[in-house]
Amino acid sequence: MSKQVGSDRVKRGMAEMQKGGVIMDVVNAEQAKIAEEAGAVAVMALERVPSDIRAAGGVARACNPKIVQEVMDAVSIPVMAKCRIGHITEARVLESMGVDYIDESEVLTPADEEYHLLKSDYTVPFVCGCRNLGEAARRIGEGAAMLRTKGEPGTGNIVEAVRHMRQVNSEVAKLTVMPDDEIMTFAKEIGAPYEVLKSIKDNGRLPVVNFAAGGVATPQDAALMMQLGADGVFVGSGIFKSEDPEKFAKAIVQATTHYTDYELIGKLAQELGEAMRGLDVNQLSLEERMQERGW
């Protein structure tokens, strides 16, 4: 009997259901409940938020399954969990637990520096990071059902997420007006599957949702990314490293939904305490930049 895998249509449909929403990193059941009450469409269960992973250094692995299970038991919204790039067993364990999505994440220390997971081989849908159309198309070709900007996680600095969202969108726009006989050469140049690029050209958009992630620290950041074309927002360290996580969580959800209501966003910001402390990305060495992981 052949093994069962989820179809691309079903997986992508599940991801589409999160469109326009906020997905929040949580490290325990209590935080997961705060996120759910604030209006998050899903939570990402992990042992440490990206800023703590960055500060601790060393090897960052998949979350203890016990924490993932506790979060799954605590909330009714979808639960995501991260695995290391290329780590088949971490992904299979999460799949066996029944998580709703797996994030093959550059936030964790890569297990394989040459190969990403063949995500089409799993029943559970995957989300992956990308900085440009080449990375986006490769992940889609492997079976990713959802994309997000890599940004620079754990910095509270939105600049890299902005760069990556603009880069992907500009390259998609370029592709849509490209003559068909040039697509193969373009595919070779950016190392992307021809079939994926042809589909993007024919439809005028990516075949999967693309969320903003990596550096979202304020309601204004979330609204900015939505204005730039993000389908939704991931918030990692920004909420639970702020002065008032409950207020921050609700404010970011509101700002994501009403991202052109500047009066509302201004009022939300006035009621908040201090945001997480940020890092200047330019001061990070190449080895410290999580966005450089994967290919």
Swiss-Prot record:
EC number: 4.3.3.6
MF terms in GO: pyridoxal 5'-phosphate synthase (glutamine hydrolysing) activity
Binding site for D-ribose 5-phosphate: D25, G154, G215, G236, S237
Keyword entries, A-Z: Lyase, Pyridoxal phosphate, Schiff base
Catalytic residues (positions): K82
A Gene Ontology biological process term: amino acid metabolic process
Record protein name field: Pyridoxal 5'-phosphate synthase subunit PdxS
Summary of the function given for this chain in its UniProt record: Catalyzes the formation of pyridoxal 5'-phosphate from ribose 5-phosphate (RBP), glyceraldehyde 3-phosphate (G3P) and ammonia. The ammonia is provided by the PdxT subunit. Can also use ribulose 5-phosphate and dihydroxyacetone phosphate as substrates, resulting from enzyme-catalyzed isomerization of RBP and G3P, respectively.
SUPFAM superfamilies linked: Ribulose-phoshate binding barrel
Family annotation (Gene3D superfamilies): Aldolase class I (3.20.20.70)
Annotated pathway: Cofactor biosynthesis; pyridoxal 5'-phosphate biosynthesis
Source organism of this protein record: Staphylococcus carnosus (strain TM300)
Entry annotated with the keyword Ligase: no
